[in-house]
Curated annotation (Swiss-Prot):
Belongs to the GcvT family. GO terms for biological process: glycine decarboxylation via glycine cleavage system. This is Aminomethyltransferase. GO terms for cellular component: cytosol; glycine cleavage complex. The keyword Transferase applies. The glycine cleavage system catalyzes the degradation of glycine. Coiled coil: none annotated. Its EC number is 2.1.2.10. InterPro entries: GCS_T, GCS_T_bac, GCST_C, GCV_T_N, GcvT/YgfZ/DmdA, GcvT/YgfZ_C, TrmE/GcvT_dom1. Pfam families: GCV_T, GCV_T_C. It comes from Methylococcus capsulatus (strain ATCC 33009 / NCIMB 11132 / Bath).
Length: 360
């Protein structure tokens, strides 16, 4: 059995089917993964995401430190409350982790790390922090709840904090003990609330009473897949650069003198051109796309499905894949020994309950 979050008893009381994920005991679903998925697309759902790593970086050199360790640039955060998404890279440009950073004040930032890389990330951050006047503090005293879906602003105003709906996307505010961010991992509008363990159960029950449906990891994965959001360990890892997984937009190349870790390797890749590109796939024959399946592109080469599954919104099998740069609009995917036709599209399928399918 993995570690339990502060909401473990709440999940059991609601009849959750539990599973282990990245060393944590978390809900897979509460009876119907499909119904939970649709609840987020059509109304509101809530997730226990307390397994994510919350880390505070503080000190006189907090900003210079993060400008060194992140490919994106926290100097872009013009005022407290702004947030950005980016990657920490190794010297070869490979992704150590993808994360969200919040600017609290000139001496304090908050990082949200992936659960599976938490200990590795902390070790790496501590090593990189040695030349800087900063502290890196994991906040193991905090829980985290994601409220997602078109009804989430109404529920947040009523339950989380009055005026929550006034937050702009990728901004955050501190209301008492609650750190409230207009962020998420579903492709829908929503909030992520970080708060003390002792308060988590009460907020969870209030959200439930206000109409938010409890959702598990299963729905979280199909929602993020439809939205084209990457999953660390599947869509990228330390052997994959941001340019090779469609995250080149998270790299801040200016100013040129900012020497972030991995910059030299990325510069070489940018000049020479990446041999691969990151795409979406729609399966045109019976079957289900799954991570690890081979992608065959006639007269070009081979690629690999990095994430795949059934889309409850589109009612089709979709996937994300890394394929040769010269790949056109069609390919075939090897499923149980047979090559199945697939259409190549841009790597996002659904946002705000709307189909975004766009042929490459």
């Amino acid at each position: 059995m993995g570690r339990c979050t502060a909401l473990h008893e709440e999940h059991l009381a609601l009849g959750a089917r539990m599973t282990e994920f990245s060393g944590w005991e978390l809900p897979l679903h509460y009876g119907s993964q499909i119904a939970e998925h649709h609840a987020v697309r059509r109304a509101a759902g809530m997730f226990d995401v307390s397994h994510l790593g919350v880390v505070d970086v503080e000190g006189l050199q907090a900003a210079p430190f993060l400008r060194r360790v992140l490919a994106n640039d926290v100097a872009r955060l013009a005022e407290p409350g702004r947030m950005l998404y980016g990657c920490m890279l190794n010297q070869d440009g490979g992704i150590v982790d993808d994360l969200v950073v919040g600017f609290i004040d000139d001496r304090r930032f908050r990082l949200i790390l992936n659960a599976g890389t938490r200990e590795k990330d902390l070790s790496w951050l501590h090593r990189q922090a040695a030349p800087f006047s900063v502290t890196v503090t994991p906040r193991d005293d905090l829980a985290m709840i994601a409220l997602q879906g078109p009804d989430s602003p109404r529920i947040a105003d009523a339950v989380v904090a009055a005026g929550s709906s006034g937050l702009k996307p990728f901004t955050a505010t501190q209301r008492g003990d609650r750190f409230i961010a207009r962020t998420g991992y579903t492709g829908e509008d929503g909030f992520e609330i970080i708060l003390p363990h002792a308060e988590a159960g009460s907020l969870w029950r209030q959200l439930f009473q206000a109409g938010a449906r409890p959702c598990g990891l299963g729905a979280r994965d199909t929602l993020r897949l439809e939205a084209g959001m990457r999953l660390y360990g599947q869509d990228m890892d330390e052997t994959v650069t941001p340019l090779a997984c469609g995250l080149g937009w998270t790299v801040a190349w200016e100013p040129e003198e900012r020497d972030f870790i991995g910059r030299a390797a990325l510069e070489r890749e940018r000049i020479g051109g990446s041999p691969s590109k990151f795409v979406g796939l729609i399966l045109e024959e019976p079957g289900i796309l799954r991570s690890g399946q081979k992608v065959a592109v006639a007269n070009v080469g081979e690629g690999v499905v990095t994430s795949g599954g059934f889309s409850p919104t589109l009612r089709r099998s979709i996937g994300l894949a890394r394929v040769p740069a010269a790949t056109g609009r069609e390919c075939r995917v090897e499923i149980r020994g047979s090559l199945k036709r697939a259409t190549v599209v841009k790597p996002r399928f659904v946002r705000r309950s709307t189909s975004l399918i766009d042929i490459c």
